[in-house]
Amino acid sequence: MKKNKNILVVAAHPDDEVLGCGGTLANLSKKGFNIYTLFVSDGVSARNETKDIIRRKIEQRKLAAIKVSKILGCKIPEFLLYPDNRLDQVPLLNIIKKIEKKIRKIKPETIFTHFDSDLNIDHKLVNKAVITATRPVKNFPVKKIILFEVLSSTEWRFSKKENFFQPNFFVDIDKSFRKKVLAAKAYKSEIKAWPHPRSLQGIKNLAKFRGQTVGKNLAEAFVIARLIK
């Protein structure tokens, strides 16, 4: 049987893919997997700036995402450009249908997306849309749904113990961490100064913490939401 080597990353904002699974994507692309990325929100329009500045920054963010795709070895991403931090104002069915359309087109076996209890409302709704769009009916291509963490969102939420991010899948990114950092730097407007968690030092600290948890130098951690064998 021919192995399905298509992977889909569904992220709320351009930069979430780097923070959540940038090293893992670099590993997978090196192994010959075809990685497609779907960005749901523009990641910018919630800011208190003029429309002209917002439009310019959206274009800059798109260009950065395309640059990142080349660094990590992914396909050129697709942008839905729904309003930033306002996905709760978009009919969920609209987002679901866009994800279903992408799945029909590329037939991925694996999907990476957000953890369902993140603080950010867009992250939560993207997770909900993905889970709905991937109902495991007969002959459905998606066999794995893997949830990633995003600095300054996953760890900032207030949640019950059962909704805490408890990873059960770790990926060694010691050899791909340099690419993760290069990709993060491409989103220069999103990288903050230490001690913000979304700083370069914060990114490395999390990778070291996740790595030491499983006896590795650097790692990314995930929750496997669904695995069908």
Q: What residue spans do the PLM features occupy?
A:
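Short, conserved clusters of charged catalytic residues that mark active-site
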Residues: 19-20, 60, 94
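Short glycine-rich catalytic loops that host catalytic nucleophiles or stabilize transition states
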Residues: 40, 79-83
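ATP-dependent adenylation/pyrophosphate-handling site
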Residues: 5-14, 18-55
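Metal-dependent de-N-acetylase/amidase catalytic core
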Residues: 1-10, 27, 31, 52, ...
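Residue-level marker of intrinsically disordered, low-complexity segments enriched
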Residues: 38, 69-70
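Generic hydrophobic, amphipathic alpha-helix propensity
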Residues: 61-65
